[in-house]
């Protein structure tokens, strides 16, 4: 987190202080004013987002009080911009208000953050965010008629509540994404409430909004995790690969200039500074649009849009066509006699340019794969440049790159083959076993979620023409969720090694993980007790949840048995459990003497 600059801009209104460089060109002035207007119009939403993300436990009523305080603050500063409090940056102002609200820090356990100042306080609030939101109640759902009545009665309060519920469940989603979600939901509510079949309309409109939020927040969390754990060089490498693939005709100097704005964007957005995040993302899009002729032919229509649609449009625009004169080979980095001298003169720039050059020539590859190839190239030159004839050594670099890609491609092909052969349910059990073996310390809900995400990635990608890049990119996001944002997150030694050793090779590392041998196995009685507790409880729970929970317990109990043995035990136990759950006295069914589960328990003990 030390890598984040943690700088901010003066707050919402704004009287312009020395900390904010004023634009001078007419087009820059227009852009600045448009961004400022957008921020001013969304003060309430931005306060809700920041407050709900920093203190997820806060009630809606408490957040509403903060919004009132913030709006009063805005009015005071508009009346007299010379007040000392009006020069605060966004995060400091919001965190001051959170800390000043009577009893709130003690009630929600963040008073330790309020005792700190400056960088340390911002860091503390950031680490107060919880990715696992299982402690929150289920997302509130209303009957469509009730929903429309609430929207009609007080649309502002209704939409604020929606923004609050979404933000607290997505603490690492960037403010522009959440504002887009709110705009889409408002549009959906307006349209659906005019229809006869409200439930159907809401269902149809909600699915793409949820998917949009999930996709972007997952990517943003993963990239911020890379910044926090591996530092700005890794963040820069990710962005070089992403932008070089999307805009293959961009020049290296133009890309370098653009990435300065992109890095500033991630500094603010990853920290959770809502105003800085909006300003810096707007600046990135303005930068791209001001040079669109030399960057991309696909974004002209996007650049004619206003905030926040412009950013969304550019992000979702198709990749530009690769220049016709651009071959697949990178002769500058494999055929030149001066490679070692150029590497030694300025290593960071040299490898950044290699990644740029290789990425724009191989737009079909995933971002993690491009980073792997760059690491392979670095290691190769480390060896070759110490030899008498370096050229004869690194001349075969392309072969090394192809070997790396072939290994990654084989992994994806195997996963897609499993998807086609097993189907979704069996494949989810496969990944559930795999994740539980590797990380049995994780709660069942998290293991199930990870396995679902992997299946969803394969279901999305395995029929596409860019199957490889799609699977590899999405699978890496799943591993990003497993590894988490906090660099101090610990699961077990082998998982921690994969999460921390090398960002690019995280996926191959996980692919070769064995069962965790440090985990203390539960007893046989614990397994049977877990099964009894599930099937004997009076509440009717989804059978799939019970099966998943039992499978997790089975893997933790007997990680070393074969897949065939595990499937046999899983089938017998769950069949017996379902049968026991349907009789009048299910507890008796689980006794050691019971013919339904007793034999299976003995079989399991033998397997162990």
UniProtKB/Swiss-Prot annotation:
Key words of the record: Disulfide bond, Glycoprotein, Protein transport, Repeat, Secreted, Signal, Transport
Modification after translation: N-glycosylated; more than 90% of the glycans are sialylated.
Subcellular location(s) per record: Secreted
Domain Albumin residue range list: 22-210, 211-403, 404-599
Annotated InterPro entries: ALB/AFP/VDB, Serum_albumin-like, Serum_albumin/AFP/Afamin, Serum_albumin_CS, Serum_albumin_N
Any one Pfam family match given in the protein's UniProt record, by short name: Serum_albumin
Region (Disordered): 585-608
Sequence similarity: Belongs to the ALB/AFP/VDB family.
Swiss-Prot/TrEMBL domain comment: The second albumin domain forms a deep binding pocket that contains palmitoleic acid (in vitro). Palmitoleic acid is most likely not the physiological ligand. Instead, this pocket may accomodate the covalently bound lipid moiety of Wnt family members.
Assembly and binders: Forms a 1:1 complex with Wnt family members; interacts with WNT1, WNT2B, WNT3, WNT3A, WNT5A, WNT7A, WNT7B, WNT8, WNT9A, WNT9B, WNT10A and WNT10B.
Name recorded for this polypeptide: Afamin
Organism: Rattus norvegicus
Record gene name: Afm
